Amino acid sequence: MNHLPMPTFGPLAGVRVVFSGIEIAAPFAGQMFAEWGAEVIWIENVAWADTIRVQPNYPQLSRRNLHALSLNIFKDEGREAFLKLMETTDIFIEASKGPAFARRGITDEVLWEHNPKLVIAHLSGFGQYGTEEYTNLPAYNTIAQAFSGYLIQNGDVDQPMPPFPYTADYFSGMTATTAALAALHKVRETGKGESIDIAMYEVMLRMGQYFMMDYFNGGEICPRMTKGKDPYYAGCGLYKCADGYIVMELVGITQINECFKDIGLAHILGTPEAPEGTQLIHRVECPYGPLVEEKLDAWLATHTIAEVQARFAELNIACAKVLTIPELEGNPQYVARESITQWQTMDGRTCKGPNIMPKFKNNPGKIWRGMPSHGMDTAAILKNIGYSEADIKELVGKGLAKVED
């Protein structure tokens, strides 16, 4: 396979990934591959560009390092070109409503006829099979959260609230990335392709597993948080200091012993309700739970965030200031690790945003390109798989492909 023009870098150099999907979930998977060195081709509709393009800034992050192909993959010669592209593809990711690709004639078996080693990842709200009531329904972030039991666990005691921004999309995209890599590892061992069925609601079901297990195995339903505090354990969650908010986790024998001395509760240590060796204080089951919260709130309210951080560092209590967005890039840890970076957009502007993560020591990722325009790489990609200028012109003339203006 001849690769498209791009630098060689990262742990996935030489891997070709193609994705068809809009907005966040599937493209996030593609973005991870692209930032780790894979050659990633982004398929867009010929008539209508990805709706993410209407956003002023986010697409510059989410579509960096990609190659843009505008092709009607379901019709006539456009379908033929897509299947020819699959012959040189390692991983194909698609996001749609249920088995939409199969309904339109592009089944796993058809894809494997063209490439027996292809890894196929299907990403949808409710999966590739199940009941007709759900399988073919559209789904976005909040839909997956609501159907999975994840949303109902979040928010405040008075009302559930979906965690933002777009948690289910990002979790599902990362699941597609890791599952596809696992499948690719096996394919290189066996030579046999794989198809992966990723239902967004099942991803969120798994992400919401912690408290669910108490219900499935005992009927206990965990209450939601109160003002950002852990529903079960005192000293865990969001707290207000004299000049802002922190989060903390009061966990550990030594940590509890020393913290209780500071807040005036040393006398309860060693009692039947808080015996020696206590590592967590249950907010409800421990009679002292409400008192711990009361004393901790009072102590924190009289100290600044800096004072609390300094003292908790001495006591080895996990704690962090709740940073505002403007505070991020000036934070010394962000600066030291270059967590925020800059890159050039295709029109020559400078864009600022999160850097590549995680950080590979021996084969680091790289930002080598901004977001491509609609159809920017169509001609180059089609030439790469054997199409002539005349062939490409014919596809464009029939409305089956779009090249950059």
UniProtKB/Swiss-Prot annotation:
Molecular-function annotations in GO: L-carnitine CoA-transferase activity
SUPFAM superfamilies found in the cross-reference section: CoA-transferase family III (CaiB/BaiF)
Localization annotation: Cytoplasm
Gene3D superfamilies found in the cross-reference section: Crotonobetainyl-coa:carnitine coa-transferase, domain 1, formyl-coa transferase, domain 3
This protein's record includes keyword Cytoplasm: yes
Pfam families cross-referenced by the UniProt entry: CoA_transf_3
GO BP term (any one): carnitine metabolic process
Pathway(s) the chain acts in: Amine and polyamine metabolism; carnitine metabolism
Coiled coil residues, start to end: none
The enzyme's E.C. designation: 2.8.3.21
Chief location bin: cytoplasm
Record note on quaternary structure: Homodimer.
Family of the protein in this entry: Belongs to the CoA-transferase III family. CaiB subfamily.
HAMAP family in UniProt: CaiB (MF_01050)
Purpose of the protein: Catalyzes the reversible transfer of the CoA moiety from gamma-butyrobetainyl-CoA to L-carnitine to generate L-carnitinyl-CoA and gamma-butyrobetaine. Is also able to catalyze the reversible transfer of the CoA moiety from gamma-butyrobetainyl-CoA or L-carnitinyl-CoA to crotonobetaine to generate crotonobetainyl-CoA.
NCBIfam families: PRK03525.1
Family annotation (PANTHER family): L-CARNITINE COA-TRANSFERASE (PTHR48228:SF6), SUCCINYL-COA--D-CITRAMALATE COA-TRANSFERASE (PTHR48228)
Designated name of the protein: L-carnitine CoA-transferase
Record organism: Salmonella gallinarum (strain 287/91 / NCTC 13346)
